[in-house]
């Protein structure tokens, strides 16, 4: 019984593919020109990559590597000096 139901479901799931339109039908509202889309995406990616390299090389963007390193906890002035604890 389960095999019959499973085969019926597979048949019903596959029926819409038999009625599918020709992918080269240019009048179809769901026809996509994949070549133009791919070329446009590559051009856009190339422009964004070039702009990113220009911004990094221009020097206007201050990177964290050029800043002075922060003080370490051991290098700061001592909070408790000798003899200051008895003044509380």
From Swiss-Prot:
Residues 1-38 are extracellular. It is a single-pass type I membrane protein. PANTHER family: FXYD DOMAIN-CONTAINING ION TRANSPORT REGULATOR 3, SODIUM/POTASSIUM-TRANSPORTING ATPASE SUBUNIT GAMMA. This is FXYD domain-containing ion transport regulator 3. Regulatory subunit of the sodium/potassium-transporting ATPase which is composed of a catalytic alpha subunit, a non-catalytic beta subunit and an additional regulatory subunit. Interacts with catalytic alpha subunit ATP1A1. Also interacts with non-catalytic beta subunit ATP1B1. Interacts with the ATP1A1-ATP1B1, ATP1A2-ATP1B1 and ATP1A3-ATP1B1 NKA isozymes. Pfam families: ATP1G1_PLM_MAT8 (PF02038). The chain crosses the membrane at residues 39-59. GO terms for biological process: potassium ion transport; regulation of monoatomic ion transport; sodium ion transport. Belongs to the FXYD family. It comes from Mus musculus. It is found in: Cell membrane. Glutathionylated. Keywords: Cell membrane, Glutathionylation, Ion transport, Membrane, Potassium, Potassium transport, Signal, Sodium, Sodium transport, Sodium/potassium transport, Transmembrane, Transmembrane helix, Transport. Residues 1-20 form the signal peptide. Its main location: membrane.
């Amino acid at each position: 019984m389960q095999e019959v139901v499973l085969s019926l479901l597979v048949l019903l799931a596959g029926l819409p593919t038999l009625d599918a339109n020709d992918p080269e039908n240019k009048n179809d509202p769901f026809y996509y020109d994949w070549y133009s889309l791919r070329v446009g995406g590559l051009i856009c990616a190339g422009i964004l990559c070039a702009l990113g390299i220009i911004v990094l090389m221009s020097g206007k963007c201050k990177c964290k590597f050029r800043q002075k390193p922060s003080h370490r906890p051991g290098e700061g002035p001592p909070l408790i000096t000798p003899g200051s604890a008895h003044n509380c």
